[in-house]
Swiss-Prot record:
Belongs to the DENR family. InterPro entries: DENR/SUI1_TIF (IPR050318), DENR_C (IPR046447), DENR_N (IPR048517), SUI1 (IPR001950), SUI1_dom_sf (IPR036877). It holds the Pfam family DENR_N. The gene is tma22. Its main location: cytoplasm. The SUI1 domain may be involved in RNA binding. Gene3D superfamilies: SUI1-like domain (3.30.780.10). It is found in: Cytoplasm. It comes from Aspergillus niger (strain ATCC MYA-4892 / CBS 513.88 / FGSC A1513). This is Translation machinery-associated protein 22. GO terms for molecular function: mRNA binding; translation initiation factor activity.
Length: 197
């Protein structure tokens, strides 16, 4: 018996989904986030065709026609409330970033040995583990991310590299961290007082 060649079914392709550059949701769901206006502006610039299908006068009128008058009022109130909440959260984050400092401490371990401890990078949205690894490669020394007693993350780099770390941070992450928010601190161990005989 001869086998009949059966057509191979075409492999189904995954659908290409566009994600918003502001809130990372699909544009159809941006209205449920707090950054609807920014999302709308991003969509207008990045994908004008999709913007027309979602935010054109016809699309908005057809969506509003299905709602009752009271539902329209509630939707408008909810949208205004969400926008105000998002604006307040954004202002709070900006204020917190402006007030926070990245501290680079030079800590003495023994007589001649020092470590450099960096704190405050997580406020700027930077990954401490990645930065610790990059610092270890850059300065060819041991570098690790640890949690301090206060529960904050800190990066410990072996050696006295505090000035170099500041320069490197400004070079690599200068857009995120302003120079005025980086402070160098020298932390010396207190010498034990000897008792008088």
């Amino acid at each position: 018996m001869a086998e009949v060649a059966q057509p191979v079914p075409a492999e189904s392709q995954a659908k290409h989904v566009v994600y918003c550059g502001v809130c990372t949701l699909p544009p159809e769901y941006c209205e449920f986030g707090g950054t609807a206006k920014k999302c709308e502006e991003w969509l207008k610039d990045a994908h004008p065709d999709m913007y027309q299908s979602l935010y054109s006068e016809e699309a908005l009128n057809s969506n509003l026609a299905t709602l009752s008058v009271s539902a329209r009022e509630r939707a408008a109130k909810d949208a205004a409330k969400k926008e105000a909440k998002a604006a307040a959260a954004e202002a709070r984050d900006a204020e917190r970033k402006a007030a926070s400092k990245v501290q680079i401490k030079r800590v003495e371990r023994n007589k001649r040995k020092h470590v450099t401890v960096i704190t405050g990078l997580d406020i700027y949205g930077l990954e401490n583990k990645k930065i610790a690894k990059d610092l270890g490669k850059k300065f060819a020394t041991g570098s690790s991310m640890t949690r301090s007693a206060g529960g904050t993350e800190e990066i410990t780099v072996q050696g006295d590299v505090s000035d170099d770390v500041k320069e490197w941070l400004l070079e690599v992450y200068g857009k995120e961290i302003p120079e005025a928010n980086i402070e160098l601190i020298e932390d010396k161990k207190k010498k034990k007082a000897t008792e008088a005989p």
